[in-house]
């Protein structure tokens, strides 16, 4: 397993070390990673996580399969089931920009307590190459994470207060985004099954990595979601299961 990480690390080095985004959190990792990659794919050659291969085996395999000489952006999901897992993964992919979506109780049997879980997720901020983080001002831990990253560029998002990137309901049919590159709206019909805050994370990550408003709009409209999540099933009696 260690050899996989070393090979993946050296492969990424050999390919010119393209701009890399690392995503972790208890919920939403896969959706945010996939949507961010979809937006960036509108203008860039992107390497991203295969499925939800987010551990010390899956991350190297994703790098092996998706990487090529033309890759200029990477978006990787980083998962953890025990202490130091995230540290190991950031040492493999060396992210330039990271985000910690949220922390809530999950896999507690392997962490022991909430403090261990939180500190493990915070390892996403630890790599010396990481010089920018995206933080949600609405999150309970925002102030703590801002203090941890006072030596980095902090880009903020919010659905409730002033931030670099904001989202709100424009009317019954649109979401309205305020961003550092301008404001725009998108029809809700293109966002079915996406949590607004996850869309905002993806928009901010992609735009900070170089995407423009047109890329965001096209990416949101073309994204088909994560397979097996938020799918609708209509039963014979017409009831709907999601």
Residue ranges of predicted features:
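Buried hydrophobic packing segments
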Residues: 4-8, 36, 40, 62-63, ...
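Conserved catalytic network of the ASCE P-loop NTPase/AAA+ motor domain
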Residues: 65-69, 91-93, 126-128
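Switch II of P-loop NTPase G domains
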Residues: 81-92
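Short, basic phosphate-binding NTP loop
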Residues: 1-22, 31-32, 37-38, 42, ...
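Short beta-strand-centered segment that lines the nucleotide-binding/catalytic pocket of NTP-utilizing
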Residues: 44-58, 102
């Amino acid at each position: 397993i260690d050899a996989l990480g070393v090979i993946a690390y050296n492969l990424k080095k050999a390919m010119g070390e393209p701009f890399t985004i690392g995503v972790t959190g208890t919920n939403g990792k896969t959706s945010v990673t996939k949507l961010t990659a979809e937006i960036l794919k509108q203008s860039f050659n992107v390497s991203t996580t295969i499925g939800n291969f987010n551990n010390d085996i899956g991350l190297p395999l994703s790098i092996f399969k998706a990487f090529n000489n033309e890759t200029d952006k990477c978006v990787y999901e980083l998962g953890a089931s025990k202490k130091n897992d995230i540290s190991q993964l950031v040492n493999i992919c060396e992210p330039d920009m990271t985000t910690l979506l949220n922390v809530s109780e999950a896999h507690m049997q392997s962490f022991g307590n909430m403090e261990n879980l939180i500190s493990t997720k915070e390892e996403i901020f630890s790599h010396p190459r990481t010089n920018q983080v995206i933080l949600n001002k609405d999150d309970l831990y925002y102030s703590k994470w801002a203090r941890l990253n006072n030596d980095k560029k902090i880009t903020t998002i919010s659905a409730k207060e002033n931030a670099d990137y904001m989202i709100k309901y424009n009317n019954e049919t649109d979401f309205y985004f305020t961003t550092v590159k301008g404001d725009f709206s998108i029809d809700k019909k293109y966002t079915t099954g996406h949590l607004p805050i996850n869309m905002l994370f993806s928009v901010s990550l992609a735009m900070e990595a170089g995407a423009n408003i047109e890329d965001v709009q096209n990416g949101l409209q073309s994204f088909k979601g994560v397979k097996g999540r938020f799918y609708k099933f209509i039963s014979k009696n017409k009831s709907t299961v999601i």
